[in-house]
């Protein structure tokens, strides 16, 4: 039986984590203690930290980390008093969450699930959804935003890190534009070969219309936005944005 692209991506990310992928390295005990003392930052995108005012007071808030495994953000939210749940499709990313929770002796609900399917939560379940860059690993993003709207409480906050497509236009050295958009390896064999050669799993470009428009169509009100770079490489050196982070509210 042929593996789904979602399964291929989960296995790819598991392998990256074993190889030392930066987004799969859990925070240290010291970082956790610092967060308990009010010294903390988290990332939705590679470089610029999320403004603290985007969150408000997290004490006793129900927080979902959507495709947010790895033991980097959820431990911080726990240290700040949040009641946390994490959903991811990578076993290794979820193992990191379990490891930090056991080390720091806190409880977190850990769920392995595919975010392209109906999310396994009741309506109006969460105060905040934290969704760092990850929807570049799924083909259709609008259904995810609809599900986020469904499971957030009224007044709930959706925080997203979004790849805006620039990365998919350029070659590996980021010197030449080699691809048209949309980048979709399920329909473009040449793009699939590029990903296989670079061990990048199955990735997809998404437009601003899909991503911010998708949030608005789901019913959210956008309240803030900032852009960000890759953190390394030629596009970063030229200060060319590849990502945006968004804050939206369910009214």
Which residues does each PLM region occupy?
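Conserved alpha-helix/loop element of class I SAM-dependent methyltransferases that forms part
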Residues: 27-61
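Class I SAM-dependent methyltransferase SAM/SAH-binding core
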Residues: 61-118
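A short acidic, Gly/Pro-enriched loop at the edge of an enzyme's catalytic core
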Residues: 116-128
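A short SAM/SAH-binding and catalytic strip from SAM-dependent methyltransferases
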Residues: 127-142
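A short glycine-rich, Lys/Arg-flanked "PGG" loop and its adjoining helix->strand segment in the class I
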Residues: 142-157
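Conserved class I S-adenosyl-L-methionine
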Residues: 157-190
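Short alpha-helix
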Residues: 202-225
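Core SAM-dependent methyltransferase catalytic element
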Residues: 218-220, 234-251
